[in-house]
Amino acid sequence: GCDYVLHVGGMVSPAADWKPYRTQKTNIGAAENICKAVLAQPNADDIKVCYIGTVAETGDRNYPIHWGRCGDPLKVSIYDHYAVSKCVAERTFVESGIKNWVVMRQSGILYPNILKNMDPIMFHVPINGVLEWCTVEDSGRLMCNLVLEDEKGNLGSDFWNHFYNIGSGKEYRISNYEFEQLLLGTLGLAGPEKLFDANWFILKNFHGQ
């Protein structure tokens, strides 16, 4: 047996947009397999499970509902197979019978190779939309601290069996226009208005907040 299961993997966009059926199989299938494995352990009631969900589950979040709350209804954007798979996977954990679970709905992950991700998804953001990014380092720290703080007894029973939105904090809340400026500036390029036609960017049906 084990004490903790941290399920942080999954098939995400843009690969999820190109291969929707594989995305469903991967994300939902993984959740089902993990739940079965946990429940099959002799100490199943003692195992604590953390599942990383996504704010994409609450769909399009343009102004004035651009900042999300944990209690917001699930409303997946049109054609967002990734978010659909995450909703079903999340439900799989919640309804599995696992005694202690927690769902962390993560925002966009900021990682060093994001500049190499040359895909049409770069235009699938409202230029005046906002996002609170979460760095890959903070994601790792969260998982580490979850285990360490629980072992110290700092996470009470009221922490488990709940949903939480997670991000890297106030300093990582930025408009998509500002984010484009930072990315392009890193490459020594002019601002987005100099390189892109505003009509290339969508106006709605984005899944960030």
Question: Could you tell me what each predicted segment is?
Answer:
Residues 142-208:
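Mid/C-terminal beta-alpha module of Rossmann-like enzyme folds, strongest
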Residues 7, 11, 32-79:
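Conserved Rossmann-fold NAD(P)-dependent oxidoreductase catalytic core, especially the SDR/UDP-sugar
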Residues 1-26:
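NAD(P)H-binding glycine-rich loop region in Rossmannoid oxidoreductase-like domains
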Residues 24-31, 35-38, 50, 85-86, ...:
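Short alpha-helix in the Rossmann-fold core of NAD(P)-dependent oxidoreductases
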Residues 15-22, 60-64, 114-115:
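Conserved catalytic-core motifs of eukaryotic protein kinase domains, centered on the activation segment
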Residues 7, 48-53, 102-108, 132, ...:
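Structural signature of the Rossmann-like NAD(P)-dependent dehydrogenase/reductase core
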Residues 53, 89-113:
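Conserved beta-loop-beta element that borders a ligand/cofactor-binding pocket
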Residues 84, 125-152:
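Substrate-positioning beta->alpha
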